[in-house]
């Protein structure tokens, strides 16, 4: 079979594989959230039974009792919720600035929920001891508080005294965003040494992941010994427990697409940390935790330990600010910018910068695209010249192929000599595409993973740049009263992208190889179906980029 025919078949098969592969792996409808449970707590160098009891269902507040438990109300411009005085558990947290969907009556996003509720998710900071004769605060301890409300302007002070006279103090502060600071002080008024270990845990019932999980990390995550550690829920489930011996723990937590809960331990110590899974009472439970080495408090002395909990939206500038202010290494990597991090984050900064002036991320995308196009103009011009020369050389290349058809080595040698003589780079025509690939994926990542793009409108029917175009030509863009299946959701922006791509192809020099030229003619149609499920912000970028390319090609054709 002719090699060109083989290449054509391979190209068509590859294109179809991309389309259906994308549909299978990335465009599945969002699954319903499952009602399952979160994790047990384990650690080395500690009485395992005591540590396990911290997060066992038996110690959880029952559903019917949850409303009766005394609580400290949380109130800030970003958060509302409460902290249970019983067990001092952060288990009720709502993100005031974010709605669950675009509907008018949509409730705000709930991050934390009490144990034994439908979407149980909570955090704890506390103390344990391997000395059985000493009673420390635990999940059943009811703390005394000097205030009923925690706000950025008013910290809350709590205390509890055991039968030996040992006093435990906790001061909780919250900033205007999503960071809690918990300072624990132990005053040893007894006549015995007190060995303690500080711990922190985040405990969560497993829920099904959002769509497109293959291009986005969701699950346990952290920075340990200045290295980013990411584990999928399946990884932890298979291993049951992933342990790290004493090490520098900057932060560990659980991340979703847009939300993060994270423990940030005191920097004065090293910690053992664990990512755990357990199946309890028919539900799956996941937990991340850290625990310090034993610290001994002598009689008459005291010890203070400061830890933090981040629980909120993964805003880029906010994570950057915390990383710098509190020296939290790699905190911005909680946002999955992907392999092209070095490009993706600057692209986001550029979009966010122009958003500050125009107030619309869609317009910001248009401005950034113009800048990228201007930066690449010289390269595009060189590419055009190279493609033009290649087309002019095609008759001579065909002559050489006929002359040395049976001598592949001589054939390649003669063709390379021709390129050298005519000063033609055969791959120069591909350079703009190769350069644009990381830019394309960077813009896609920015649109898909950054909270700033979530529910960000453009104009008209586009209410969310991070979601696909909601219209489709198969019901005449909403004029006909029926909803086509998902693979036929081909909206106005995908169609505009395909049309502008076709027009740009018509203005560009034709490829010298007729088989490749035929394949390229099908690309707008292939891309129409493949990209219809992409975030509409990406289609706006691609369409606008095609329009600029048409203008650029007109200029190059006229002056070259």
Swiss-Prot record:
User: Where is this protein localized, as stated in its record?
Assistant: Cell inner membrane
Asked if Cell inner membrane is a keyword of the record, the answer is yes
Q: How does it sit in the membrane?
A: Multi-pass membrane protein
GO CC terms in record: plasma membrane
Any one Pfam family match given in the protein's UniProt record, by short name: YidC_periplas
Primary site of residence: membrane
- Residue stretches spanning the membrane: 5-25, 334-354, 357-377, 431-451, 476-496, 522-542
Which domain of life does the protein's organism represent? Bacteria
Keyword vocabulary terms for this entry: Cell inner membrane, Cell membrane, Chaperone, Membrane, Protein transport, Transmembrane, Transmembrane helix, Transport
Q: Does the keyword Cell inner membrane apply?
A: yes
The entry's function note states:
Required for the insertion and/or proper folding and/or complex formation of integral membrane proteins into the membrane. Involved in integration of membrane proteins that insert both dependently and independently of the Sec translocase complex, as well as at least some lipoproteins. Aids folding of multispanning membrane proteins.
Q: How does it assemble?
A: Interacts with the Sec translocase complex via SecD. Specifically interacts with transmembrane segments of nascent integral membrane proteins during membrane integration.
The protein's matches in NCBIfam families, at most eight in alphabetical order, are given as: PRK01318.1-4, yidC_nterm, yidC_oxa1_cterm
Q: What is this protein called?
A: Membrane protein insertase YidC
Gene for this protein?
A: yidC
């Amino acid at each position: 079979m002719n090699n060109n025919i083989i290449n054509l078949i391979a190209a068509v098969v590859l294109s179809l594989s991309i389309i259906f592969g994308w549909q299978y792996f990335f465009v599945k409808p969002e699954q319903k959230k499952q009602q399952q449970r979160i994790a047990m707590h384990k650690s080395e160098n500690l009485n395992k039974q005591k540590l396990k009891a911290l997060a066992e269902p038996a110690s959880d507040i029952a559903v019917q009792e949850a409303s009766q438990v005394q609580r400290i109300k949380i109130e800030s411009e970003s958060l509302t919720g409460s902290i249970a005085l019983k067990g001092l558990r952060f288990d009720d947290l709502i993100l005031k600035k974010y709605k669950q969907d675009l509907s008018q009556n949509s409730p705000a996003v709930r991050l934390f929920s009490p144990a034994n509720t439908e979407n149980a998710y909570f955090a704890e900071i506390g103390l344990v001891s391997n000395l059985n004769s000493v009673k420390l605060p635990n999940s059943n301890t009811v703390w005394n508080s000097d205030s009923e409300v925690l706000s950025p302007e008013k910290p809350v002070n709590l205390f509890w005294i055991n039968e030996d006279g040992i006093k435990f103090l906790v001061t909780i502060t919250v900033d205007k965003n999503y960071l809690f600071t918990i300072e624990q002080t132990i005053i040893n008024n007894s006549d015995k040494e007190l060995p303690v270990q500080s711990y922190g845990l985040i405990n969560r019932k497993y829920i099904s992941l959002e769509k497109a999980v293959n291009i986005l990390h969701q699950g346990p995550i952290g920075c340990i010994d200045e290295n980013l550690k990411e584990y999928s829920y399946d990884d932890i489930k298979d291993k049951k427990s992933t342990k790290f011996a004493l090490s520098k723990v900057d932060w560990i937590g659980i991340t979703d697409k847009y939300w993060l809960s994270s423990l940030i331990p005191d920097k004065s110590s090293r910690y053992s940390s664990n990512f755990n899974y357990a199946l309890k009472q028919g539900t799956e439970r996941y937990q991340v935790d850290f625990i310090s080495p034993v610290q001994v408090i002598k009689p008459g002395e005291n010890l203070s330990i400061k830890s933090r909990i981040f629980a909120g939206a993964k805003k880029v500038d906010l994570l950057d600010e915390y990383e710098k202010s509190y020296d939290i290494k790699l905190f911005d990597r909680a946002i999955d910018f992907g392999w092209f991090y070095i490009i993706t984050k600057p692209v986001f900064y550029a979009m966010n910068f122009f958003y500050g002036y125009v107030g619309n991320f869609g317009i910001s995308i248009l401005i950034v695209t113009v800048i990228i196009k201007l930066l690449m103009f010289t390269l595009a011009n060189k590419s055009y010249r190279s493609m033009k020369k290649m087309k002019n050389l095609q008759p001579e290349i065909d002559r050489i192929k006929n002359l040395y058809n049976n001598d592949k080595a001589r054939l390649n040698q003669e063709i390379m000599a021709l390129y050298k003589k005519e000063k033609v780079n055969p791959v120069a025509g591909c350079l703009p595409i190769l350069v644009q690939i990381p830019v394309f994926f960077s813009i896609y990542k920015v649109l898909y993973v950054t909270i700033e793009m979530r529910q960000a409108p453009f104009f008209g029917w586009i209410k969310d740049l991070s979601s696909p175009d909601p219209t489709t030509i198969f019901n005449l863009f909403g004029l006909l009263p029926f909803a086509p299946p998902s693979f036929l959701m081909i909206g106005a922006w995908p169609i505009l992208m395909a049309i502008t791509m076709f027009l740009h192809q018509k203005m560009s020099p034709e490829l010298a190889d007729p088989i490749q030229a035929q394949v390229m003619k099908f690309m707008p149609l292939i891309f129409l179906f493949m990209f219809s499920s992409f975030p509409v912000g990406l289609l706006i970028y691609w369409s606008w980029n095609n329009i600029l390319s048409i203008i650029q090609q007109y200029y190059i054709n006229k002056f070259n």
